[in-house]
A protein has these predicted regions:
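Long, low-complexity intrinsically disordered regions enriched in Ser/Thr/Pro/Gly
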Residues: 85, 123, 130-132, 145-151, ...
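SF2 helicase catalytic motif II
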Residues: 1-28
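Conserved SF2 helicase motif VI
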Residues: 167, 173-204
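Conserved RecA-like helicase motor-core motifs
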Residues: 48-57, 92, 115-135
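Conserved helicase motor
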Residues: 96-99, 125-142, 160-163
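Conserved two-lobed SF2 helicase motor
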Residues: 151-166
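Conserved strand-helix element at the start of the C-terminal RecA-like helicase core
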Residues: 29, 33-37, 78-115
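Interdomain hinge/linker at the junction between the two RecA-like core domains of SF2 helicases
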Residues: 32-84
């Protein structure tokens, strides 16, 4: 997506303009709507438009019970996950990475091996990530396509940001939601990921104290950061000018 970003944006602009020029309808949805999204879409239109905006003001009458694990690592949370599965609870586990020490695949392997050794039983689990959902014949493909039908087949489902938005698990199957966040994705995406299961069930959450990414060039010097942002701003403007009709020299 990054490599083809300009081509994607160019195609998107032409599609929006074409639809609006032919009296078509553009329906835009955003779980974290702001003026940035609205202004961007208005700028893509070839003519001035005034969008009709519907805001969902609904709020739950009762909040979630959330258990935060204030520890250096998520081992205590993973132990609680193990106990819940041994007690027969169905668990939905959202992570922000597929591989690594606390990635979805690693935790999935650990849980299956541990429970099999302790109980000599098989816990049916599923990992949903970019790799499994793009593998022909993998159960994750069917899971994503009909999530409310497939969910009851699993004791635990481990997901990455691949399933962080765009789906709604309405069926009452999962008894617990777990979140293991190492600072890879921003907090709005974390909230979205934890809300995929709609039922008001307990949420167990571990978050890293610091994110894994860097800001700008990664420098700790404010002057270096300012210079990087200024240069990056100019480069992006130059790249975007043919698409967004920006006068770079203005």
């Amino acid at each position: 997506c990054k490599k083809q970003r300009l081509a994607i944006l160019n195609t998107f602009q032409h599609l929006i303009a074409r639809v609006l020029d032919t009296d078509g309808l553009v329906i835009a949805q955003d779980a974290d709507l702001s003026d940035i999204s609205i202004d961007y879409l208005k700028q893509l239109a070839s003519n001035e438009i005034e969008p009709w905006i519907a805001i969902n003001q609904w709020q739950a009458k009762q909040g979630w019970d959330v258990y935060f694990y204030d520890r250096p690592n998520p081992t205590a949370l993973i132990h609680q996950l193990e106990l819940d599965l041994r007690a027969g609870h169905k668990c939905y586990v959202t992570t922000d990475s597929r591989s690594g020490r606390y990635g979805s695949e690693t935790i999935d392997r650990y849980i299956k091996q541990t429970l099999k050794q302790l109980e000599d039983s098989y816990t049916k689990t599923l990992v949903v990530c970019s790799h499994t959902t793009n593998t022909t014949g993998h159960p994750a493909v069917d899971f994503v396509s009909s999530i409310n039908t497939q969910a009851p087949a699993y004791d635990a489902v481990f997901v990455t940001p691949t399933l962080g938005t765009g789906v709604s698990i309405d069926i009452k199957h999962f008894d617990r939601v777990y979140g293991i966040l190492q600072g890879v994705i921003p907090d709005p995406e974390v909230r979205q990921a934890l809300a995929r299961v709609r039922a008001n069930v307990p949420r167990h959450l571990w978050c890293a104290k610091r994110g894994m990414g860097t800001i700008g060039s990664g420098s700790n010097n404010y002057r270096s950061l300012a210079d990087w942002y200024q240069e990056n701003y100019k480069e992006n403007y130059a790249l975007m000018s043919p698409i967004m009709r920006i006068d770079v020299d203005a």
